Amino acid sequence: QHWSHGLSPG
């Protein structure tokens, strides 16, 4: 999945 730049998937 694609995550917005600047946010970490955590």
UniProtKB/Swiss-Prot annotation:
The modification Pyrrolidone carboxylic acid is found at residue 1. Keywords: Amidation, Hormone, Pyrrolidone carboxylic acid, Secreted. The keyword Secreted applies. GO terms for molecular function: hormone activity. One of its GO terms (cellular component) is extracellular region. Its main location: secreted. InterPro entries: GnRH. The modification Glycine amide is found at residue 10. Pfam families: GnRH (PF00446). It is found in: Secreted. The keyword Lyase does not apply. Stimulates the secretion of gonadotropins. Belongs to the GnRH family. This is Gonadoliberin-1.
